[in-house]
Amino acid sequence: SDMYSFGL
């Protein structure tokens, strides 16, 4: 859901 979760 954010850039740290790689699109999750």
Swiss-Prot record:
One of its GO terms (cellular component) is extracellular region. One of its GO terms (biological process) is neuropeptide signaling pathway. Coiled coil: none annotated. Keywords: Amidation, Neuropeptide, Secreted. The modification Leucine amide is found at L8. It is found in: Secreted. May act as a neurotransmitter or neuromodulator. Belongs to the allatostatin family. This is Carcinustatin-18. The lineage of its organism: Eukaryota, Metazoa, Ecdysozoa, Arthropoda, Crustacea.
